[in-house]
Swiss-Prot record:
Gene3D superfamilies: Transcriptional regulator MraZ domain
Name of the featured protein: Transcriptional regulator MraZ
UniProt KW keywords: Cytoplasm, DNA-binding, Repeat, Repressor, Transcription, Transcription regulation
Gene: mraZ
Location, primary (coarse class): cytoplasm
Cited function: Negatively regulates its own expression and that of the subsequent genes in the proximal part of the division and cell wall (dcw) gene cluster. Acts by binding directly to DNA. May also regulate the expression of genes outside the dcw cluster.
Keyword Transcription belongs to the record: yes
Cell location: Cytoplasm, Nucleoid
InterPro entries associated with the record: MraZ, MraZ_C, MraZ_dom, MraZ_N, MraZ_sf, SpoVT-AbrB_dom, SpoVT-AbrB_sf
The SpoVT-AbrB domain, residue ranges: 5-52, 81-124
Ranges in coiled-coil conformation: none
BP GO terms, sorted: negative regulation of DNA-templated transcription; negative regulation of DNA-templated transcription initiation
Protein species of origin: Escherichia coli (strain K12)
Single GO MF descriptor: DNA-binding transcription factor activity
Amino acid sequence: MFRGATLVNLDSKGRLSVPTRYREQLLENAAGQMVCTIDIYHPCLLLYPLPEWEIIEQKLSRLSSMNPVERRVQRLLLGHASECQMDGAGRLLIAPVLRQHAGLTKEVMLVGQFNKFELWDETTWHQQVKEDIDAEQLATGDLSERLQDLSL
């Protein structure tokens, strides 16, 4: 399980160094093989260990190519999916087209989200967090049943 937000740097070749606390888990569970794709709802990337991505691919394969919405989701997620192998130094190369989509330059937030990571431009991440907090403070209390059961 991945959790927390960590500031990492992209080098001049577009590689990011995976924090040490995740490396062993990624090597053990995915042999360092990852898949990166775009988030179709936010200006960030989604980074999955290969076994987790294969579950997503199975679900995508069950969607209908005759349904325009389902086909669009398939096209966006699969069409942007890029395999990346963690190297011996614990780095992942993020494809240029993906970096461009998320506006990633040098400072990147690696955000753990259970079975995957999100990759955000640092400034965009902080803006998103502020927007999310502001939205929650303005919320009228219409919580889903699952959120009503969540006690912090």
